[in-house]
Protein backbone atom coordinates (compact mmCIF):
# COMPACT_ATOMS: atom_id res chain seq x y z
CA UNK A 1 0.00 0.00 0.00
CA UNK A 2 1.39 3.40 -0.96
CA UNK A 3 -1.31 5.98 -0.14
CA UNK A 4 -4.99 6.83 -0.39
CA UNK A 5 -7.02 9.98 -0.77
CA UNK A 6 -10.59 11.10 -1.24
CA UNK A 7 -10.93 13.14 -4.42
CA UNK A 8 -14.04 15.33 -4.46
CA UNK A 9 -15.03 16.87 -7.75
CA UNK A 10 -17.68 19.32 -6.60
CA UNK A 11 -20.83 19.92 -8.61
CA UNK A 12 -21.53 23.09 -10.59
CA UNK A 13 -18.02 23.48 -11.95
CA UNK A 14 -15.70 21.34 -9.85
CA UNK A 15 -12.16 21.85 -11.16
CA UNK A 16 -10.73 20.20 -14.24
CA UNK A 17 -7.93 17.72 -13.61
CA UNK A 18 -5.62 18.25 -16.56
CA UNK A 19 -4.02 15.33 -18.38
CA UNK A 20 -1.19 13.85 -16.34
CA UNK A 21 0.52 10.66 -15.22
CA UNK A 22 0.80 9.75 -11.53
CA UNK A 23 4.31 8.32 -11.29
CA UNK A 24 6.01 11.72 -11.58
CA UNK A 25 4.25 12.85 -8.38
CA UNK A 26 5.55 9.86 -6.37
CA UNK A 27 8.26 8.05 -8.37
CA UNK A 28 9.21 4.44 -7.63
CA UNK A 29 12.12 2.24 -8.68
CA UNK A 30 9.88 0.64 -11.32
CA UNK A 31 6.45 1.09 -12.83
CA UNK A 32 4.59 -1.75 -11.11
CA UNK A 33 2.38 0.78 -9.36
CA UNK A 34 -1.35 1.18 -9.88
CA UNK A 35 -4.25 3.16 -8.51
CA UNK A 36 -7.66 1.73 -7.70
CA UNK A 37 -10.54 4.18 -7.66
CA UNK A 38 -13.97 3.56 -6.16
CA UNK A 39 -16.88 5.83 -7.07
CA UNK A 40 -18.80 6.58 -3.88
CA UNK A 41 -21.83 7.90 -5.79
CA UNK A 42 -23.33 7.04 -9.16
CA UNK A 43 -21.23 8.77 -11.84
CA UNK A 44 -22.64 9.55 -15.27
CA UNK A 45 -20.98 11.34 -18.21
CA UNK A 46 -22.28 14.77 -17.07
CA UNK A 47 -20.22 14.52 -13.86
CA UNK A 48 -16.80 14.61 -15.57
CA UNK A 49 -15.73 11.03 -14.92
CA UNK A 50 -12.05 10.20 -15.13
CA UNK A 51 -10.82 9.79 -18.70
CA UNK A 52 -8.01 7.39 -19.59
CA UNK A 53 -5.95 7.31 -22.80
CA UNK A 54 -5.85 3.58 -23.68
CA UNK A 55 -2.33 2.20 -24.13
CA UNK A 56 -0.66 5.38 -22.86
CA UNK A 57 1.06 3.43 -20.08
CA UNK A 58 3.24 1.94 -22.84
CA UNK A 59 4.22 5.37 -24.17
CA UNK A 60 6.60 8.04 -22.92
CA UNK A 61 6.63 9.68 -19.52
CA UNK A 62 5.96 13.38 -19.90
CA UNK A 63 7.66 16.34 -18.24
CA UNK A 64 5.34 17.96 -15.69
CA UNK A 65 7.54 21.06 -15.36
CA UNK A 66 6.94 24.10 -17.57
CA UNK A 67 9.50 26.04 -19.62
CA UNK A 68 10.46 28.12 -16.55
CA UNK A 69 11.15 24.91 -14.58
CA UNK A 70 8.03 25.26 -12.42
CA UNK A 71 6.16 22.09 -11.46
CA UNK A 72 2.70 22.22 -13.04
CA UNK A 73 1.46 18.68 -12.42
CA UNK A 74 0.13 18.38 -15.98
CA UNK A 75 1.29 17.52 -19.48
CA UNK A 76 2.10 20.56 -21.63
CA UNK A 77 -0.13 21.57 -24.53
CA UNK A 78 2.76 20.80 -26.89
CA UNK A 79 3.19 17.27 -25.53
CA UNK A 80 -0.57 16.65 -25.65
CA UNK A 81 -0.31 16.79 -29.46
CA UNK A 82 1.64 13.50 -29.22
CA UNK A 83 -1.38 11.74 -27.68
CA UNK A 84 -4.63 10.54 -29.21
CA UNK A 85 -6.90 12.48 -26.85
CA UNK A 86 -9.94 11.58 -28.97
CA UNK A 87 -9.42 7.95 -27.94
CA UNK A 88 -10.00 8.73 -24.25
CA UNK A 89 -12.36 6.38 -22.47
CA UNK A 90 -14.40 8.04 -19.72
CA UNK A 91 -15.06 5.76 -16.77
CA UNK A 92 -18.60 6.24 -15.48
CA UNK A 93 -20.70 3.80 -13.49
CA UNK A 94 -22.86 3.24 -10.44
CA UNK A 95 -21.64 3.76 -6.88
CA UNK A 96 -19.13 1.03 -6.09
CA UNK A 97 -17.64 1.00 -9.59
CA UNK A 98 -13.90 0.30 -9.40
CA UNK A 99 -11.43 1.91 -11.80
CA UNK A 100 -7.85 0.69 -12.21
CA UNK A 101 -4.99 2.49 -13.91
CA UNK A 102 -1.25 2.04 -14.09
CA UNK A 103 0.97 4.85 -12.79
CA UNK A 104 2.16 5.65 -16.35
CA UNK A 105 -1.36 5.92 -17.80
CA UNK A 106 -2.33 9.40 -19.04
CA UNK A 107 -5.60 10.45 -17.41
CA UNK A 108 -7.62 13.50 -16.39
CA UNK A 109 -11.16 14.86 -16.18
CA UNK A 110 -13.16 17.90 -17.24
CA UNK A 111 -14.91 20.30 -14.83
CA UNK A 112 -18.01 18.78 -13.23
CA UNK A 113 -20.86 20.82 -14.67
CA UNK A 114 -23.61 18.72 -13.10
CA UNK A 115 -25.21 19.76 -9.81
CA UNK A 116 -23.95 16.57 -8.12
CA UNK A 117 -20.56 16.01 -6.50
CA UNK A 118 -18.36 13.16 -7.67
CA UNK A 119 -16.45 11.64 -4.73
CA UNK A 120 -13.76 9.17 -5.79
CA UNK A 121 -11.79 7.15 -3.23
CA UNK A 122 -8.29 6.46 -4.59
CA UNK A 123 -5.79 3.90 -3.27
CA UNK A 124 -2.33 3.45 -4.78
CA UNK A 125 -0.53 0.12 -4.51
CA UNK A 126 2.86 -1.06 -5.69
CA UNK A 127 4.64 -4.36 -6.00
CA UNK A 128 6.77 -4.96 -2.89
CA UNK A 129 9.91 -4.60 -5.04
CA UNK A 130 8.76 -1.20 -6.42
CA UNK A 131 10.20 1.11 -3.78
CA UNK A 132 9.28 4.79 -3.42
CA UNK A 133 12.11 7.14 -4.40
CA UNK A 134 10.78 10.13 -2.45
CA UNK A 135 9.45 10.20 1.09
CA UNK A 136 6.11 11.85 0.27
CA UNK A 137 4.09 9.22 2.14
CA UNK A 138 6.72 8.04 4.62
CA UNK A 139 5.41 8.06 8.16
CA UNK A 140 1.81 7.47 7.13
CA UNK A 141 0.06 4.99 9.40
CA UNK A 142 -0.37 2.41 6.62
CA UNK A 143 2.21 3.60 4.06
CA UNK A 144 4.40 0.81 2.72
CA UNK A 145 2.24 -1.84 4.41
CA UNK A 146 2.45 -5.18 2.62
CA UNK A 147 -1.13 -6.18 1.78
CA UNK A 148 -0.34 -9.50 0.16
CA UNK A 149 2.84 -11.56 0.04
CA UNK A 150 5.95 -10.51 1.92
CA UNK A 151 8.47 -7.71 1.93
CA UNK A 152 10.96 -7.79 -0.93
CA UNK A 153 14.59 -8.59 -0.24
CA UNK A 154 15.61 -7.12 -3.59
CA UNK A 155 14.39 -3.94 -5.24
CA UNK A 156 13.52 -4.09 -8.92
CA UNK A 157 14.77 -1.19 -11.04
CA UNK A 158 13.29 -0.28 -14.41
CA UNK A 159 15.85 0.83 -17.00
CA UNK A 160 13.59 3.69 -18.14
CA UNK A 161 14.03 7.04 -16.38
CA UNK A 162 11.36 8.65 -14.22
CA UNK A 163 10.91 12.38 -13.67
CA UNK A 164 11.47 13.57 -10.10
CA UNK A 165 9.01 16.02 -8.51
CA UNK A 166 10.14 19.05 -6.52
CA UNK A 167 11.66 18.29 -3.12
CA UNK A 168 8.40 18.23 -1.17
CA UNK A 169 10.36 18.59 2.11
CA UNK A 170 11.44 22.08 0.99
CA UNK A 171 8.11 23.13 -0.50
CA UNK A 172 4.61 22.63 0.75
CA UNK A 173 3.15 19.66 -1.11
CA UNK A 174 -0.07 20.85 -2.64
CA UNK A 175 -2.91 18.91 -4.19
CA UNK A 176 -2.94 18.25 -7.91
CA UNK A 177 -5.71 20.86 -8.16
CA UNK A 178 -3.49 23.54 -6.58
CA UNK A 179 -0.53 22.69 -8.80
CA UNK A 180 -2.58 22.66 -11.97
CA UNK A 181 -4.48 25.86 -11.14
CA UNK A 182 -1.25 27.67 -10.12
CA UNK A 183 -2.65 28.49 -6.69
CA UNK A 184 -0.37 29.60 -3.88
Model-derived segments and spans:
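Short, surface-exposed loop/helix-turn segments at secondary-structure junctions
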Residues: 21, 74-85, 117, 135-145
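Short aromatic-enriched loop/helix-cap "lid" or pocket-rim segments at secondary-structure transitions
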Residues: 14, 49-50, 62-65, 132-137
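Non-heme Fe(II)/2-oxoglutarate
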Residues: 98, 104-184
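Conserved hydrophobic/aromatic beta-strand scaffold that supports enzyme active sites
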Residues: 5, 35-39, 88-90, 98-100, ...
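Conserved double-stranded beta-helix
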Residues: 1-52
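Double-stranded beta-helix
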Residues: 43-110
Amino acid sequence: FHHSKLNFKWGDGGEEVKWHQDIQFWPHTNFEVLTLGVYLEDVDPTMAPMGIIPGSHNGPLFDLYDESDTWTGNISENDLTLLELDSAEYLSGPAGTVTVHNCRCVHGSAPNLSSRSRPLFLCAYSAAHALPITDLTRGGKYSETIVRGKAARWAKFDSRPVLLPPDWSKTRHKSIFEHQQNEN
